[in-house]
């Protein structure tokens, strides 16, 4: 195993500090980082995409686990520290200076890959929703192991009837399995954020037949966009949705937070079947 200087020394050497504008918080605890890198399991010689590696704390743990890492970093200040890591692990780390929101990750990776990242807080949810979207399923990613604020993590794994349950839960659970294997105390970060964090782990399941991802996304967006309203009000903007509720035994007086993932899937399937498709064959 290569001998690496302590991460704090690397940060001091390169004059790095976490950027609030970029939503950065650095993790130094090597044991904690090793545990995070261990969640996907069996990373030896597997392709891993990391977003926002910063000075490379989690990157070290992933390389130590044997992964081939592609890291996308927007902060130019962090590039020299990551370049040093590339030299220690030749051929194992590819660093891309760019905005992860503007890159095609599947095209970039060119093979099945796991995503493991301490996501910058300001783009984390948007990236997550993007990975969960699209009509092509299963996706090219084999698992997502992501650090979020604990409140966001709880929204992803929540169940109907709870205050945390909403659009994120439905998008994460309708064709994937989502869990929260680890909570991370705020004191583990530099600088310590105001809130606790947690790791979410997501693996793709089979795609339910006859359901369009776009239809489901539109339904959840409308339903949870006005979550205090009854479905007959909140779904008015989705053509045919209110009329279709009765066909799948969902009372129109219910609110979105009581509707299960399975019920949303059934509604999307029925809605798709009742409207002419633009795709032939």
Curated annotation (Swiss-Prot):
<feature type="binding site">
    <location>
        <position position="27"/>
    </location>
    <ligand>
        <name>S-adenosyl-L-methionine</name>
    </ligand>
</feature>
<dbReference type="GO" id="GO:0003723">
    <property type="term" value="F:RNA binding"/>
</dbReference>
<keyword id="KW-0694">RNA-binding</keyword>
<dbReference type="InterPro" id="IPR020598">
    <property type="entry name" value="rRNA_Ade_methylase_Trfase_N"/>
</dbReference>
<dbReference type="InterPro" id="IPR001737">
    <property type="entry name" value="KsgA/Erm"/>
</dbReference>
<feature type="binding site">
    <location>
        <position position="73"/>
    </location>
    <ligand>
        <name>S-adenosyl-L-methionine</name>
    </ligand>
</feature>
<dbReference type="InterPro" id="IPR029063">
    <property type="entry name" value="SAM-dependent_MTases_sf"/>
</dbReference>
<dbReference type="Pfam" id="PF00398">
    <property type="entry name" value="RrnaAD"/>
</dbReference>
<dbReference type="InterPro" id="IPR023165">
    <property type="entry name" value="rRNA_Ade_diMease-like_C"/>
</dbReference>
<keyword id="KW-0949">S-adenosyl-L-methionine</keyword>
<feature type="binding site">
    <location>
        <position position="118"/>
    </location>
    <ligand>
        <name>S-adenosyl-L-methionine</name>
    </ligand>
</feature>
<comment type="function">
    <text>Specifically dimethylates two adjacent adenosines (A1518 and A1519) in the loop of a conserved hairpin near the 3'-end of 16S rRNA in the 30S particle. May play a critical role in biogenesis of 30S subunits.</text>
</comment>
<keyword id="KW-0489">Methyltransferase</keyword>
<comment type="similarity">
    <text>Belongs to the class I-like SAM-binding methyltransferase superfamily. rRNA adenine N(6)-methyltransferase family. RsmA subfamily.</text>
</comment>
<keyword id="KW-0963">Cytoplasm</keyword>
<dbReference type="GO" id="GO:0005829">
    <property type="term" value="C:cytosol"/>
</dbReference>
<feature type="binding site">
    <location>
        <position position="25"/>
    </location>
    <ligand>
        <name>S-adenosyl-L-methionine</name>
    </ligand>
</feature>
<dbReference type="InterPro" id="IPR011530">
    <property type="entry name" value="rRNA_adenine_dimethylase"/>
</dbReference>
<dbReference type="InterPro" id="IPR020596">
    <property type="entry name" value="rRNA_Ade_Mease_Trfase_CS"/>
</dbReference>
<dbReference type="GO" id="GO:0052908">
    <property type="term" value="F:16S rRNA (adenine(1518)-N(6)/adenine(1519)-N(6))-dimethyltransferase activity"/>
</dbReference>
<feature type="binding site">
    <location>
        <position position="99"/>
    </location>
    <ligand>
        <name>S-adenosyl-L-methionine</name>
    </ligand>
</feature>
<keyword id="KW-0698">rRNA processing</keyword>
<feature type="binding site">
    <location>
        <position position="52"/>
    </location>
    <ligand>
        <name>S-adenosyl-L-methionine</name>
    </ligand>
</feature>
<protein>
    <recommendedName>
        <fullName>Ribosomal RNA small subunit methyltransferase A</fullName>
        <ecNumber>2.1.1.182</ecNumber>
    </recommendedName>
</protein>
<keyword id="KW-0808">Transferase</keyword>
């Amino acid at each position: 195993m290569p001998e690496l200087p302590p991460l704090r020394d690397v940060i001091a050497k390169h004059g790095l500090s976490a950027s609030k504008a970029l939503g950065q918080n650095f993790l130094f605890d090597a044991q904690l980082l090793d545990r995070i890198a261990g969640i996907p399991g069996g990373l030896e010689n597997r392709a891993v995409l990391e977003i926002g590696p910063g000075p490379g704390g989690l990157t070290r743990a992933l390389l130590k686990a044997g992964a081939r890492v592609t890291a996308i970093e927007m902060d130019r200040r962090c590039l020299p520290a990551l370049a040093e890591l590339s030299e220690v692990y030749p051929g194992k780390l590819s660093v891309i200076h760019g905005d992860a929101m503007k890159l095609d990750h599947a095209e970039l990776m060119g093979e099945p890959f796991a995503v493991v990242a301490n996501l910058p807080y300001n783009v984390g949810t948007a990236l997550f929703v993007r990975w969960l979207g699209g009509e092509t399923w299963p996706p090219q990613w084999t698992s997502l192991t992501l650090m979020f604020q604990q409140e966001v993590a709880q929204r992803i794994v929540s169940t109907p009837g709870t205050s945390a349950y909403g659009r994120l839960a439905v998008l994460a659970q309708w064709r994937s399995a989502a869990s929260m294997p680890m909570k991370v105390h705020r004191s583990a970060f530099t600088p310590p954020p105001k809130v606790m964090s947690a790791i979410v782990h997501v693996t793709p399941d089979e795609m339910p037949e006859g359901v369009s991802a776009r239809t489901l996304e539109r339904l959840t967006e409308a339903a949870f966009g006005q979550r205090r309203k009854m479905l007959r009000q909140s779904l008015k903007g989705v053509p045919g949705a209110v009329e279709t509720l009765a066909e799948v035994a969902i009372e129109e007086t219910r609110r979105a937070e009581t509707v299960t993932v399975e019920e949303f899937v059934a509604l999307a399937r029925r809605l798709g079947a009742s409207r002419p498709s633009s795709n032939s064959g």
